[in-house]
Regions:
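Catalytic center-proximal scaffold of phosphoryl-transfer enzymes
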Residues: 2-6, 121, 159-161, 166-529
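Short, flexible loop/hinge motifs at secondary-structure junctions
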Residues: 1-184, 227, 256-257, 320
Length: 529
């Protein structure tokens, strides 16, 4: 039976209603998605403003000793948070501000008598007698700058001949050529290159600016000359020290690593804009002499980390960030950086909800704050690593267990940053408790991040390395300079000692040990005074 026109119209209307409902549903989903994107962008803007204009510290001052809460305001306990015993922090005494004399006590002092009175001024106004000195006092102190200077030294070689044999068929001669030049064919001395290296790697002063400074001293030393000599000296004299430090590092059981991108212009078969990497590999908090090494590689492949640690005994502890490439390092106990976890959670707290302890981001962050508070208290009390091991198991393990329980049930909802934080933490869940196994294990990767900072600061000034050889030389100088800093040495003096002593691959480890920054003689010669 044919449908009537009314039936056809009714069917068409139903189809139209169905289409409209689908359109409404699609539009509602689009609106919800755009609203979520809008909220995420607002949160991103708030985070960027905080990064640009707010405090960079992740710590929050407690209102009174022992308070583990993060934010000021009414005290509310976060939902389902366990509360282990609180460790009270000792009250810090404010350090007394040093006097002017104390600030500059290590500077050489010269006393200059004041003599501005004429002979007439020194006649007594009552009786007319000539006055005599009866006492002195210091009326002011000034710091005077003496501009550095460069000198040209000409070494004169004397030739000696035998007076008895001079008229024979075999006259005898000998010439005193002295010590070989620091760098063959170059006028650059040990002291000059020490200054150039100190200014570039200690003060982050680029070579083009040093070139201008030398011109003011009537010395046209080009940046290309400086760069060439820096590379040559690094290869000849710093590489043996670096290899010695590396051998020492492979005997250690607690290590830390980090990496950062750099630009190297003239790498084979690679565009100049391609990222290369500097790595820092350093010893951890084991109470032994710190060793800090830098390494250059064209890529970020985890194989580079594995290759650098080749030869180390299995079972060592490695603290690193979340980069998966570190998984290439086999037979190691991986530790997770709790500072990274705390940072992710802090950045996921929505603006205006800092006091809302029902917010999952705040809850997760409070767990981290409690752990950091315990760690600070252990350092304040001066606990040794055995005591730290015991206290961590008693204080911190229950907190981490509560954190893991929170992690299993937490719902990030529409908070994109919290989703990212949760994913980051879950990918590292198996490493969260590794540091509890030994009191010498680091709780965070802050030490290696602090060690990689000179690279990032220098990168802003140097901008790039021209060649792989230059990049490798940079890592050698950074190693020497940062090692000197770790032992409180005068950077220029230590560089100068190494260049004057000229370490070589022919030296034994016992000989190289005498040039290490932890050597007592080196400490005395390179003290900051």
């Amino acid at each position: 039976m044919a449908k009537s026109s009314k039936d056809i119209q009714l069917s068409e209307l139903k189809d139209l209603i169905s289409q409209l409902n689908m359109t409404i549903k699609t539009l509602n989903e689009t609106i919800a998605r755009q609203q979520q994107e809008n909220d995420n962008l607002k949160a991103e803007m708030a985070w960027l403003k905080q990064k640009l204009f707010g405090s960079s510290s992740e710590r929050r001052a407690a209102p009174f000793p022992g308070q583990m809460g993060l934010f000021d305001g009414e005290e509310e306990k976060p939902l389902e948070l366990i509360e282990p015993e609180v460790v009270s922090l000792p009250k810090k005494s404010r350090k007394k501000k040093p006097t002017l004399k104390e600030q500059f006590e290590n500077l050489p002092t010269k006393q200059v008598p004041v003599d501005t009175l004429s002979d007439e001024d020194k006649i007594c106004s009552i009786c007319g007698t000539q006055m005599v000195p009866i006492g002195t006092e210091i009326i002011r102190t000034e710091i005077v700058y003496t501009r550095p200077k460069l000198e040209r030294i000409e070494y004169i070689a004397t030739t000696y001949g035998c007076p008895q044999c001079k008229d024979t068929e075999e006259p005898q001669f000998i010439k005193d050529n002295g010590r070989p030049a620091f760098i063959e064919g170059s006028y650059v001395s040990e002291s000059l290159l020490s200054l150039i290296a100190y200014q570039k790697y200690g003060l982050y002063l680029p070579l083009y600016r040093q070139e201008k400074d030398f011109l003011q001293l009537n010395a046209p030393i080009s940046r290309s000359t400086m760069a060439k000599n820096l590379i040559t000296a690094a290869q000849e004299y710093l590489q043996p020290m670096y290899d010695f430090f590396h051998r020492k590092l492979l005997y250690r059981r607690f290590l830390m690593m980090d990496e950062t991108p750099v630009q190297v212009l003239k790498e084979d078969d690679r565009r100049a804009q391609t990222k290369s990497y500097f790595w820092v590999i350093r010893t951890g908090e084991d109470g032994l002499n710190p060793i800090i090494l830098y390494n250059y590689t064209p890529t970020r492949a985890g194989e580079n980390a594995r290759r650098f640690l080749n030869g180390i005994a299995p079972g060592f502890y490695l603290m690193a960030d979340g980069y998966q490439g570190y998984n290439k390092v086999q037979e190691t106990n991986r530790c997770c950086c709790w500072a990274h976890i705390r940072r992710y959670l802090l950045e996921s707290i929505p603006k205006g909800m800092e006091k809302d302890y029902t917010n999952p981001a705040v809850q997760g962050f409070l767990y981290c704050e409690k752990l950091f508070a315990y760690e600070r208290s252990y350092r304040e009390k001066g606990l040794n690593y055995k005591q730290i091991y015991t206290r961590r198991l008693k204080d911190e393990k229950p907190v981490i267990e509560g954190f893991l329980a929170w992690l299993k049930q937490v719902d990030p909802g529409s908070n994109g940053k919290l989703k990212k934080a949760i994913t980051y933490i879950r990918n590292r869940e198996e490493f969260l408790m590794t540091y509890l196994e030994d009191g010498r294990c680091s709780f965070s990767n802050n030490l290696s991040e602090n060690s990689i900072r000179p690279v990032t600061v220098g990168r802003k000034n140097w901008l790039f390395s021209d060649t792989p050889e230059g990049a490798q030389a940079n890592t050698l100088y950074l190693t020497v300079v940062e090692m000197a800093k770790a032992y409180g040495l005068d950077l220029y003096k230590y560089l100068n000692i190494l260049f004057e002593q000229r370490p070589s691959g022919d030296m034994s480890d016992e000989e190289l040990e005498k040039l290490a920054p932890w050597n007592e003689s080196v400490k005395e010669l390179c003290s900051v005074k």
